[in-house]
Each structure stands twice: as C-alpha cells, then as structure tokens.
C-alpha cells in the first residue's frame, strides 16, 4: 500500500481537524442530528459515563435526551492528527467544557453566568474515509480535571 504524500497528509489532517471542530459546534448548537452525521454509519462514541453508543441513531438519541436548558461551549485545543494511511487517521484533542443554565438571566452584555465548575478533558478519535468523506469512526471522551 502506498503511503500518502505530504500534500495528501495535510488534506487528511485538515479534514479530520474540521470534524473535531464541527462536532463541538454541532454539540453546542444542540444540533444532534448534525453531530451524529459526523460519525461513520457504525461509529462508536464512548462518553465519560454510560455505555458506548453504537451507530448514528444511538448517538443522536442519547444527545437529544440532554436537558434543553443547558448551554455548553466546548473549547478545543491541541488538536493533533496522525495520518495512518490514505483511509485512516487518529488524533487527540484537549477540551475545556463550560456550561450555563439557559433559563438564567443574562448579566448585561456579558451573557449568562457560567457554572462554577469547568471540566477539562480529551477526545481520542479514530477517523476513516467513507463514501461520504472523512468521518469519526470512534471517539473516546474522558475528563482529566475540573475546577
């Protein structure tokens, strides 16, 4: 099997990095259908609590059951993508998770007060090239620390 060229590797890294960022944005918008669509058909999501979610429908349903009045912001950094082949890659991302209660009154132009606890965690992702393009094949999310 021929290894990807440096240009091809850069394109794969960019596609996978965009998946990470789009997954955070879709999650924060509470657009769980769009979030699930970023996974492969048989994608697996492992969260810090609960059993693994297998398949897009299970991922979407689990996230859609979250409280609607919870505002979140997943701030992603240190996104490192490693290209394994022309069809697979893996990566890690640091995540700071902020949340707030949507029913709380905004504090002037500063928005709603954030919860006192900030969670810091990691995503470990495995990516694969599908007929629809690059998708998350497997994500393991874990918390490392909190305030």
Explain the meaning of each model-derived region.
Residues 103-112:
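Short, surface-exposed loop/helix-turn segments at secondary-structure junctions
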Residues 1-33, 37, 41:
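Short, low-complexity N-terminal intrinsically disordered segments enriched in polar/charged residues
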Residues 6, 10, 53, 114:
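Charge-dense, low-complexity intrinsically disordered segments
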Residues 2, 90, 114-147:
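Short beta-strand edge/turn micro-motifs at domain boundaries
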Residues 32-102:
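A solvent-exposed, acidic/Ser-Thr-rich amphipathic alpha-helical stretch
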Residues 15, 73, 119:
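Soluble or luminal CAZymes and related metallo-dependent hydrolases
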Residues 18, 76, 122:
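Short, conserved clusters of charged catalytic residues that mark active-site
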């Amino acid at each position: 099997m021929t290894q990807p060229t440096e240009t091809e590797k850069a394109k794969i890294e960019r596609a996978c990095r965009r998946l990470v960022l789009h997954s955070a944005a879709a999650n924060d918008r509470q657009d769980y259908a769009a979030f699930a669509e970023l996974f492969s058909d048989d994608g697996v999501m492992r969260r810090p609590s609960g059993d693994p979610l297998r398949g897009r429908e299970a991922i979407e349903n689990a996230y859609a059951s979250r409280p609607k009045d919870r505002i979140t912001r997943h701030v992603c950094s240190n996104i490192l993508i490693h290209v394994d082949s022309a069809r697979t890659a893996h990566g890690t991302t640091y995540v700071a998770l902020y949340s707030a209660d949507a029913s709380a009154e905004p504090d002037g132009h500063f928005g709603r007060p954030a919860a006192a606890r900030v969670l810091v965690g990691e995503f470990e992702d495995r990516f694969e090239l599908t007929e629809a393009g690059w998708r998350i094949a497997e994500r393991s999310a874990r918390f490392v620390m909190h305030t």
